[in-house]
């Protein structure tokens, strides 16, 4: 370890420490990139007067080595966390074994080091604990369902990275009249859960949260009018077709119809109505039919849905009911190349036309149309093209992107315990097994669950039985498989939340139970935060007809769970 007198902090750190010494109040922690270098004859310390009392109670500096942390510096109760803690992992990714590749020291100060220094020479105030908790809980909600129709609770949580958040979600129950065996009419439920991961703005995802269930329900109603027993049968093409039609009809209205109206009258209202066509969004919609206990998952894009339960031997298993639809999915690559023969650049660097990562999405007009009714979009008046975006390179034979979903079905039995839906930001941070294990641990503490078989401080073993695991992008952010710390001092999870979706988000940010990671990643403001994490949206639904507390008295009620819900604050 270098002597303290040979450690030089960069100028921004000096300025912040100077402010701290001035007596002004600041938040508890400060995130800053710092560098250590040989500086034997420097007059730096005496000139700044910062480190004269470096061994006093006012200021202590410590260098800690580890696979993830490069440096910690402590200034009285104020904390300085090196930005290398996060940047080293982000910038240097992981190797094939999953280990972290950290940059090697460069004492000569090469151009590469100088470039990295200039790019990362920025500071972020770390929020205090109460503000971090407020952010984590700001967008959480939980509901008890006492309808006796197969789902007894669902939790939702979000953590923005973009400002405003580009994700959205929907939870809705639609009742359908069913004729029972004795000829009586009874009501059964269709549960809809949706997550919409937007990009290029919040407009498309917001539109989907309001309209997608309505469009799908209308198409299902058309099928039901022709066949009253359609919801009794096992998975069938009629329901799948209705869901697909709802998706495609909404996307057609978003893109084609909005631009058609813009050609007819380029007024401000019609210009604004094209915003959901200009931005884009993935869509993940789950439909649980309480009549036959069939769960259908429709995915457009790269959000993911998991179901978890016990197999016949009592082992926990997790299964993905969706496959990530990106330019890295070989099935999607083959489909798109077949639709656009003779276009070698249709998939470039794992992206559609070298730009868009999801291969299916709502909106994203610039990957779908050049003209409407034979009229080129370039013919619109300039004022109508205010929000237009540049046409991609090699844009020859649109559409290159579709909103048509891929639909899968699963029978929900008594051993299927819960479903987790998440935007891709969650799966960048956690594996399918980790997500299922974290929910099981949460259930062990918060529900009447049989004791979980796992070592103290460890997550229970879960087997991933997904059919197409190779097509799913693995979790890659902040993964460190070299940790040798005992579970007691370095636990693999945190369990602090009453809302299980918030519990998943907290642990996704913790890099294996490290609270300092949660603090850092929650504190980084937008837009800088997008370098380190995406918007996070999570929904967890619990299957079964038990587990609802006595707070629910009405036999058909849906009741807010107050201890796991943060009521929205009035916005001026």
Curated annotation (Swiss-Prot):
UniProt-listed InterPro entries: PP2C, PP2C_BS, PPM-type-like_dom_sf, PPM-type_phosphatase-like_dom
Positions of Mn(2+) 2 binding: 197, 424, 480
Keyword Nuclease set for record: no
Binding site for Mn(2+) 1: 197-198
Cofactor: Mg(2+); Mn(2+)
Localization (cell): Mitochondrion intermembrane space
Swiss-Prot/TrEMBL GO biological process terms: signal transduction
Post-translational modification: Processed by mitochondrial inner membrane protease (IMP) complex and released to the intermembrane space.
Pfam families, alphabetized: PP2C
Catalyses which reaction(s): O-phospho-L-seryl-[pyruvate dehydrogenase E1 alpha subunit] + H2O = L-seryl-[pyruvate dehydrogenase E1 alpha subunit] + phosphate
Enzyme class: hydrolase
Chain ranges of the PPM-type phosphatase domain: 153-543
Biased composition range(s): Low complexity: 481-491
Free-text remark on how the cofactor is bound: Binds 2 magnesium or manganese ions per subunit.
GO cellular component entries: mitochondrial intermembrane space; mitochondrion; peroxisome
Region annotation (Disordered) ranges: 95-122, 470-492
Residue spans of biased composition, Basic and acidic residues class: 470-480
Function: Catalyzes the dephosphorylation and concomitant reactivation of the E1 alpha subunit (PDA1) of the pyruvate dehydrogenase complex.
Family: Belongs to the PP2C family.
Additional note from the record: Present with 7550 molecules/cell in log phase SD medium.
Protein name: [Pyruvate dehydrogenase [acetyl-transferring]]-phosphatase 1, mitochondrial
Underlying gene: PTC5
